[in-house]
From Swiss-Prot:
Part of the RNA polymerase complex. This is DNA-directed RNA polymerase subunit Rpo11. Keywords: Cytoplasm, DNA-directed RNA polymerase, Nucleotidyltransferase, Transcription, Transferase. DNA-dependent RNA polymerase (RNAP) catalyzes the transcription of DNA into RNA using the four ribonucleoside triphosphates as substrates.
Length: 112
């Protein structure tokens, strides 16, 4: 399965905090990622998307565009924001694969 490409601009990447910009993305990806991150102990993840008039698809002026921003913070000493991001991505990929299998199975049953 070919996944869509996602542009990611890493603003900060250390144990305590990861700051990302996700140009061209919307609440769909940001909310999923935030959900997977916040399920982990010692991690707080938030994101911000500016008003749609400043979004990529509605931009009037290239310089006014503000990409979505995600902040991942480790709030416990033993938590690592970088590792949390990697775990969240892996978890989401597994969930997508499971959903794909469920849909395929349901479609095969319907066809028989």
């Amino acid at each position: 399965m070919k996944l869509p490409e996602v542009e990611v601009v890493v603003k900060k990447y250390d144990k305590d905090e990861v700051l990302l910009e996700l140009p061209g993305e919307d609440h769909t990806l940001c909310n999923l990622l935030r959900w997977a991150l916040n399920r982990q102990d010692g991690i707080i993840a938030t994101y911000r998307i500016e008003h749609p008039i400043l979004g990529k698809e509605h931009k009037v002026d290239e310089e006014r565009y503000v990409p979505p921003k995600m902040r991942i913070r480790a709030v416990d000493e033993d938590a690592d924001a970088r590792e949390a991001l990697e775990r969240a991505i892996e978890e989401l990929l597994e969930l997508v694969e499971e959903a794909k299998e469920e849909f395929s199975g349901a479609l095969e049953e319907k066809e028989s």
